[in-house]
Amino acid sequence: MDLWTALQALILGVVEGLTEFLPISSTGHQIIVADLLDFGGERAMAFNIIIQLGAILAVVWEFRRKILDVVIGLPTQPSARRFTANLLIAFLPAVVLGVIFADLIHHYLFNPITVAAALVVGGIVMLWAEQRQHEVHAETVDEIRWTDALKIGFAQCLAMIPGTSRSGSTIIGGLLFGLSRKTATEFSFFLAMPTMVGAAVYSGYKYRDLFVPADFPVFAIGFVTAFIFAMIAVRGLLKFIGSHSYAAFAWYRIVFGLVILATWQFGWVDWTAAQP
């Protein structure tokens, strides 16, 4: 492993960690940054699976007490069973649609122009959702109804389009469906666990031949970096939403997306040459 490859792994690990749980699309940022760094091919596909596992481990660690309480309480506590059922209900739409459409979406939509357009559209929707008046009926994740979970699950499916953002879709969906900002954010984090682990296991098995021992040092750098920066992002976001809305993230999406579109329109960067 040369120094440049290690630096690529470090940068992409930071990008994954910081963006995975913020409503700004980690996949979109990965596509753009990987293209700028010329990091692609089979190694990149395997690398992305590994760094996503690093990011999700950060959420598992951050919410380990809640997870342990739920596991212990499953046999006797209705609230634990309801919480688990809601996660499964919200998880199922992504499983079904992901298996059906994942390859088509990866082939046709995994490019910086799609990402830029989705960033802008998602930012506009986020601003609208924040300004829209909606009644809150769930102040904690234990108060979420199964119908809320199902609708959030379908909202999560929008994130199959790169640039949309899985966390953005589920958080904004939660706000629109009656969850408080904190509850929508926390449920998005919990929903990420089965969704991302399931996607990683599916992709890992599908592309198992891409994992070669020579790349393990690169994977290790990305995994550890993603874990550390995802932890920072999760804690920072939970603190941020205590006194702020998601408007700042919406404007970031819009500006970033417009910059990418402008560089493409004026020919400053040949984004159309990017490979998934």
UniProtKB/Swiss-Prot annotation:
Catalyzes the dephosphorylation of undecaprenyl diphosphate (UPP). Confers resistance to bacitracin. InterPro entries: UppP. Keywords: Antibiotic resistance, Cell inner membrane, Cell membrane, Cell shape, Cell wall biogenesis/degradation, Hydrolase, Membrane, Peptidoglycan synthesis, Transmembrane, Transmembrane helix. Belongs to the UppP family. One of its GO terms (biological process) is regulation of cell shape. It is an enzyme of class 3 (hydrolase). It is found in: Cell inner membrane. It is a multi-pass membrane protein. The keyword Cell membrane applies. The chain crosses the membrane at residues 43-63, 85-105, 109-129, 184-204, 214-234, 254-274. Its main location: membrane. GO terms for molecular function: undecaprenyl-diphosphatase activity. Its EC number is 3.6.1.27. It catalyses: di-trans,octa-cis-undecaprenyl diphosphate + H2O = di-trans,octa-cis-undecaprenyl phosphate + phosphate + H(+). The keyword Plastid does not apply. It comes from Pseudomonas fluorescens (strain Pf0-1). One of its GO terms (cellular component) is plasma membrane. This is Undecaprenyl-diphosphatase 1. Bacitracin is thought to be involved in the inhibition of peptidoglycan synthesis by sequestering undecaprenyl diphosphate, thereby reducing the pool of lipid carrier available.
